[in-house]
Amino acid sequence: MLIITGTGVTNVSLMWQQPLLMERNGIILGFVVRLSRVTSRDTIELTTAYTNITVAPLTPYTLYECVVAAYTSVGTGPFSSIIFTRTEPTSKSY
């Protein structure tokens, strides 16, 4: 399960759990994280060995689609369900 743990003006923090042992196709080597801008489909793809990441720099007040997948020596597994998040605006109006 992928969750948003924080958002800023130019960053998003994500956290997830490893796949269950019976769902793995070998030893997990790492994770692929993808964030796509909803309006333009521009995509950022990162890899990490950890189950959390902060992605930056992102565009302020922009809606992103986020997914994550584990990978092994066999290849990349299925991506998680899509979650959406929006970065914060550069300034707040009162």
List PLM regions with ranges:
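Extracellular low-complexity, O-glycosylation-prone stalks/linkers
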Residues: 1-94
